[in-house]
Each structure stands twice: as C-alpha cells, then as structure tokens.
C-alpha cells in the first residue's frame, strides 16, 4: 500500500512539473524569452507550494481536535485528503478507547470497595464513589493532592513509603473511627499505584469477638487446671501412698494437664500479641546474648540426644523491640529445630545484618516439611502430621506466635525445607528495627 501511495505522489509531482514546463515553454514562445519564462513558472510553482506548506503549518499549530484540514487541489489536495482520513481513523480509535475507559470507570464506580489511582509520586489521579464514602475524598478539589495529606494515619504513611505491599494494612477510616479499612496497594506501569480499600469492620468485629472469647475461656480454664495439676503433683510426690494400679493413669493425667497448661499459656500470649500492633517496650535488645541464653536452653532440651547446636551472632547488631516477645519467637524456632531433628543432628543459629536489615536463621538437619505445607505452617493449630505433634508435645501455636511477634517488630518469616534433609527458618527485620550496640569507651 505504501509503495502505491509513493508511486501516486511521484506521478502527480512529475505531472505538475511537466505542466509547469509546458506552460513556461508556451510563454517563452510568445515572449521570446525562454529562460525568464521558465524561471517565472518555477517561481510561481514554488510560491504556491510554500503557501500550501504555510497553510498546513498553521492548521497543525492552531487546529481544534475535530477541525478538518484546509481544502486544496492537485498534489496538495491529496496530502490534505490523506491527513483528513488519518484524522478520522484516529477519532474513531479514540472514541473506541474512550468507550472502554468509560465502561471501566462505570464498573469500578459501582464497586462497594474504594478504587484509587495514584501517580508515581503518590498524587491522586482518579477514584470512585466508594472512595469518597470511605475516605472522604472530594471531587474535584482533591485531584492531584498527595494521598498522605488526606490519609494522615502514621501507619499508612509508613506503609505507603516503604513500598512493601505484600501484606495488606488495616487502619481506622480517616472520617469515621468506627470503620475499619483494609488497604491493598499494587504497583503498575511507571511506578504508579492502584489502591483498593475495603470495609472490613464486620470481619474485624468478629475477629475481636473470637479473640475475646479465647482469652476469656483461657483465663477461666487456667485456675481449675492449676488446681488439678497441683493435686496431681502432690499425689505423684508421694508415690508410696498411691495404688500401683493408678500410678500410670496419674502420670498420664499429669502429662495431659501440662499440655493443656502450655496450650492455655500460648493462647493467652497470642491474645496479648493481637491486642496491640506494636510492643510497648520498644528498647534495644542485645540479640547475641539473648540467643546465647536460648542456645543453652536448647542444649538442656536436647538432653543427651547429642545435637550439635552452633551459634554465630554479630554482637554489634541489636534490635529495637520487646525482649520477652523476641525470646518467645526465637526460642520457638530453636526448640522446634531440637524437637524435629534426629539424634546427633546439627542445628545452626546465625544472626547478622546487611543493607536490607537484620536477619536470624535457624537451620537444622531434621525431617523437613513437604513444600505444599509451607504456606500454612504459621496458621493456628495447623498440623503437618498429627502424630508428630502428639509425640513432641507441641500446641500447634508456636509458629503462629512467631508470625505475630515478627509482624509487631516489622519483620517477616521465610521458610524453606527439603523433606529428609532439613529446614531453614529465617526472620528478616526491616532496617528501621536495627539498633547498633553502644561501644564502651576504653578504660
């Protein structure tokens, strides 16, 4: 098609030049000045061409989107006609695209969830009606405003700036504290943001009811269990007074009472962790000393199973947070490694820091976990193998506690495992949680 158009243009140009030459030749015959006649003819043709170029230039500079190009004839008539047809095609394509955009905007406007489009700098570009109802956005005066100026919650600003959107954020609505909103942010295009906001107030209320129920039941069961465990301990401390037929039954009762107490303690700890978003005592923690203490406890737990437990901890790297919560999380990881690693196996504990933050890894040569179970390991009471849990005395809440402690300390848990070869649990802490140890002045 392009070659045919080029041939038409060349043919039209040759015809126009031949016409100018013929007219100049006739004028030269009449006047007797062939050179001047030819020069005059070419000058007139050049002037006409320049005039058409000027018309095209003015149209391109000043025309409205739907204004057609100027009329002409001959070669320039074909140029303007082609521009007109191209303009019409673009108008039709633009109309189709606008119809698609309108349809998308109409469908998103009908959503009950808020949909907000932000540019690469976090400024508002477009939002639907639900965003106005949930966040109080106003059309059109909020257009172009930074989203952090309109949603002023400190956790939102921190969440938005860190650009780690793998987990959603839950905060109260900026216009109604009773509403609980969940934010999902996705990066697309040239670092632009698509933000989805959902009202999860009802889910939050049900979750709070569940937490309160578990906490209350745990508290109510704690006292009778303590009484039962105390009587069982008293009876077993006086074995000579116990009928031999009841001795094994009492020992089993004491074992199960101990498991119930551990379960209640874990449930109460989870309820405490879920009650607030951040630990109250956010102080620098000497992780190397903490891990050394946990390693000693792990060696005592190993109790003759000949585990090789090594520790490599950077003493200069500390964490800001709750020492009690960190001890609970780290000891859960290390004690699990001891429980699920065969006799004479190896457990490596490593603590270090780099430009991405601080990291704790617990690597073992245990039985490992099938990859299909890894995404659910941190769920409450999730069992890879129920018989395995009963043999080790676990409550099924250890990794759930680890997950909640890490969330409260701006960290995440990474799990890798190969069945039959072992597992590695790695805690990744954000740079903001890292605190350098104070260096003592030389004496």
Swiss-Prot record:
It catalyses: ATP + protein L-histidine = ADP + protein N-phospho-L-histidine. The keyword Zinc-finger does not apply. Keywords: ATP-binding, Cell membrane, Kinase, Membrane, Nucleotide-binding, Phosphate transport, Phosphoprotein, Transferase, Transmembrane, Transmembrane helix, Transport, Two-component regulatory system. It is a single-pass membrane protein. InterPro entries: 2-comp_sensor_kinase (IPR050351), HATPase_C_sf (IPR036890), His_kinase_dom (IPR005467), HisK_dim/P_dom (IPR003661), HisK_dim/P_sf (IPR036097), PAS (IPR000014), PAS-like_dom_sf (IPR035965), PAS_fold (IPR013767). The chain crosses the membrane at residues 17-37. Residues 93-182 form the PAS domain. One of its GO terms (molecular function) is phosphoprotein phosphatase activity. Residues 216-433 form the Histidine kinase domain. The modification Phosphohistidine is found at residue 219. GO terms for biological process: cellular response to phosphate starvation; phosphate ion transport; regulation of DNA-templated transcription. Its main location: membrane. The keyword Cell membrane applies. It is found in: Cell membrane. Its EC number is 2.7.13.3. Member of the two-component regulatory system PhoR/PhoB involved in the phosphate regulon genes expression. PhoR may function as a membrane-associated protein kinase that phosphorylates PhoB in response to environmental signals. NCBIfam families: phoR_proteo (TIGR02966), PRK11006.1 (NF008235). This is Phosphate regulon sensor protein PhoR. It comes from Pseudomonas aeruginosa (strain ATCC 15692 / DSM 22644 / CIP 104116 / JCM 14847 / LMG 12228 / 1C / PRS 101 / PAO1).
């Amino acid at each position: 098609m392009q070659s045919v158009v080029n041939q038409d243009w060349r043919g039209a140009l040759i015809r126009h030049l031949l016409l100018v030459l013929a007219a100049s030749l006739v004028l030269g015959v009449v006047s007797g000045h062939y050179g001047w006649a030819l020069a005059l003819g070419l000058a007139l043709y050049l002037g006409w061409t320049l005039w058409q170029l000027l018309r095209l230039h003015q149209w391109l500079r000043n025309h409205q989107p739907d204004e057609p190009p100027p009329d002409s004839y001959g070669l320039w008539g074909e140029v303007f006609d082609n521009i007109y047809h191209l303009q019409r095609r673009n108008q039709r394509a633009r109309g189709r695209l606008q119809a698609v955009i309108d349809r998308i905007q109409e469908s998103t406007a009908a959503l009950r969830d808020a949909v907000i489009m932000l540019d690469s700098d976090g400024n508002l570009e477009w939002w639907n009606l639900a965003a106005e109802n949930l966040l109080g956005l106003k059309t059109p005066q909020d257009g172009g405003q930074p989203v952090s100026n309109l949603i002023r919650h400190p956790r939102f600003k921190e969440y938005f700036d860190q650009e780690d959107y793998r987990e959603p954020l839950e905060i109260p609505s900026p216009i109604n504290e009773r509403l609980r909103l969940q934010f999902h942010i996705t990066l697309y295009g040239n670092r632009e943001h698509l933000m989805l906001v959902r009202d999860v107030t009802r889910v939050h209320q049900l979750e709070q009811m569940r937490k309160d129920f578990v906490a209350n039941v745990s508290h109510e069961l704690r006292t009778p269990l303590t009484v039962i465990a105390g009587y069982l301990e008293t009876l077993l401390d006086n074995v000579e007074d116990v009928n031999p037929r009841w001795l094994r039954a009492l020992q089993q009762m004491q074992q199960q009472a101990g498991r119930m107490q551990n379960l209640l303690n874990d449930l109460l700890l989870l309820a405490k962790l879920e009650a607030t978003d951040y630990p109250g005592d956010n102080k620098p923690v000497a992780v190397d000393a903490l891990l050394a203490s946990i390693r000693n406890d792990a060696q005592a737990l190993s109790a003759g199973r000949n585990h090789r437990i090594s520790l490599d901890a950077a003493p200069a790297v500390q964490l800001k947070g709750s020492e009690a919560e960190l001890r609970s999380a780290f000891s859960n990881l290390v004690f699990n490694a001891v429980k699920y690693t065969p006799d004479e196996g190896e457990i490596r504990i490593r603590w270090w820091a780099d430009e991405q933050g601080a990291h704790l890894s617990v690597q073992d040569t245990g039985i490992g976990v099938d990859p299909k179970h890894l995404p659910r390991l941190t769920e409450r009471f999730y069992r890879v193998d129920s018989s395995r849990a009963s043999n080790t005395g676990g409550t099924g809440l250890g990794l759930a506690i680890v997950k909640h402690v890490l969330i409260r300390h701006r960290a995440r848990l990474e799990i890798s495992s190969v069945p039959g070869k072992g597992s590695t649990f790695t805690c990744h802490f954000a740079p903001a949680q890292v605190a350098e140890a104070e260096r003592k002045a030389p004496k």
